[in-house]
Amino acid sequence: MSDINKTCIIDGKEYLLSDVEAMGFNGFSVSAHVSPYRSLFKYYPNTKKYVSSEKKYHNYSFEALQNGTIFLQDAKNFDDCFDCAVDLSWDKFLENRLSNYCNYFDVDTSLSKGIADKIYSLSVKLYECGMLDGALEAIHLTDPIQKGYVELFLRRVFADLTSENKQWNEAIVNAIRKEYDDFIQCLSKFKISCFSTSPYLNRMWSSAYGNNNQGFCIEYEIDVTTEEGRNLYNNIYPVIYSQHRNDLLQLSEHCDLSPTKEDLWQMFFNGLLRKSLHWQDQQEWRLILADGFIDKNPKPFFKIKRIYLGNKMPHKERIKIVNYCRKHTIPYVGLVRDKDSFNLIECEGDCYLCQRRRTEKSLKEKSK
């Protein structure tokens, strides 16, 4: 029996976490995209939301259908409170950053017994530099991002000393605390849109995504024959389901250096793609883009191939969706409960004809 803390599930298959991590960003991406899915599916609640700034209601689900777009959002808006949440020890982060700053300013920490000693030694060194300009001149780093990071640290320290009247130890700890908060927020610089590999998932239909079976599901046709399509699909990755919590301590140790592809992989492997095994039946894939690479949001996506109507979709909404699909020649199908299992299956009838007969029957009854 496999150790649940050492394994993970990716696209329905079990792997060792250590093997997946060893793939690196390139290896994982190649493995994920070597055999492209022909379709991916996105569940929509088909509900209205009031937008106070516009003083009107929006049905973003129907707008996605009309415009052929998908919306990328922050992970904090997802239904899993652990999603992309980073639990990073403040004490370890503080110790790592202190060690780095002591190294940058040639502070001897060989006799230091702990964090307090390092703070004191660094305080003495910065005090000897005099004012802020003197401390800035003491920086001898070539990496522009690293140099800028240290400059920001110094400006925060000296700002606290002058305007807040803090002591050296307080100012140093406060500056590193701000670095810690900035680092924790790094995952929010990415936006995510979620997809599944099947339109028949009970978990998705019964959740907020499918609005208790009252929403609909859009099937998108994956087309990698164009450069635009390949670029889009290559930014969609399978979720890594595991019971092992994410930890970005390794990445935080050199968070002031120019980021590398390995740094990006650690962010994806331990954060953006990591979810609990409890959610594996969502069969999730994620389109992940950094803020700076999103030209439009909602973003144009692959061609809509088919619409799946929820088993409990209200009559009025079902007519609306069906009529739209018929007008724009988009195939559609209603989902019903299988008589012999707990699976959702496609209805053999045409929703349009069923709804038409239902409407005619209702009109006849009213005319009696």
Where do the model's predicted regions map?
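Partner-binding and oligomerization surfaces adjacent to conserved cores of proteins
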Residues: S2-K368
